[in-house]
Amino acid sequence: MINFCFDKIIDVSTSTVYPNLGAKLEGEFMDIVGDFSTTYPFSDPPRLLEYFRDEDISFTIHSSNDCPPDSFYFINVNFFDHAVDWFGMMSLSTLLHAQQKKFKILFYYCEGDRPSRVRNTLHKYAKKHNIDAQQIHFISHSSIANQVKNFYYLNDDEILFKNAQNYSNSQAQWHSNRRSKKFTCLIRSHKNWRLVVAAMLNKIGIYENSYGSYNKINFSDGFDHTDDFVDISNNPLANIPARLAIDVFNKIIPFSPDELSDTERNNYEMFVGKYYTDAYWNIICETHLDLDGTSGAFITEKTWKPIRHNQPFVVIGTVGSLYHLQSLGYRTFDGIINESYDYEKTDFLRVEKALAVIHELNTKSLEELNEINFQVKDIVQHNSKLFNAPKRNRLMKLIKQLLNSE
């Protein structure tokens, strides 16, 4: 069994705890629980423990002043600021216990920052406070986290999005009926590289046959030129000749096929069925194209959406995204489409190859895409079933790694 410790326990029976090193907020805990993630130093309540409860995985929680040996002092970080000295924020008693190795320190972080850089920052502050760096452990959303000692990988979004969609009882099924759109391609937030991708998609006519969107861009701040998109330091796709395409695309954005607010679009419980049941393929513009200069893959709810809802997809994201999905047990569509783009390490070349695949799909009629729909049936149904399955095995693997750590 794994043990965790916290400075302030609200209710042992429900494992409700005040987040370690969280902001000092006023009010009843349930009224302020959503504010920790947006308030410095951005330490959240530990949702990993919720996952354990959902999967009937045993664990215990204890006071950090009186905990079993090898307990984990849990810090759930919503945003990793390298200027934050986490150990310097500990109370004197908690810091003393850390120095005396009465517990291990476990960070939980759902982003893809370079693991080695995070390690170096934490070790620097640990040395400052006379804490043994080997006491520090870190769970990351980067697929290469395991390459760094005492770092571990868990795809939090695979569990979080599944739970949210289950809560809203949202599930699209595969069907054989004709669909009116070739693609769904939804981009909620602007990024320089996403603008290049979207402009090129527009150039080859994708949005004419899609449920498409490009949102959260505001020209009132002077953002009305292409200068930001031709500098490789600002845009990893600067080598793609997209200036004219961007000029054309700038005239039509923002646009959306729905009237949802940005908050609603970002809500994991949200479900718009037609995006999956009335379009044949999903074009995914993931969160990252390059994962902090590493070879890591970063899979978020953007990819889990079509997987849950029985829809084939093309991923424009980090190198090896499809390979990583396969390592998790999912199947992709090589043989039906050319997925060699996934192995291209150069970002702009990978995107160009993915765009070529999308263009090839777009040349097909709705009738032809409906025929392909039968070819992908077994794959998408396998993926949806796997996604919806319990994640106990993934979580038990993580626990085993933590308990076997030095």
Language-model region placement:
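Pol beta-like nucleotidyltransferase catalytic core
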Residues: 2-284, 290-300, 307-406
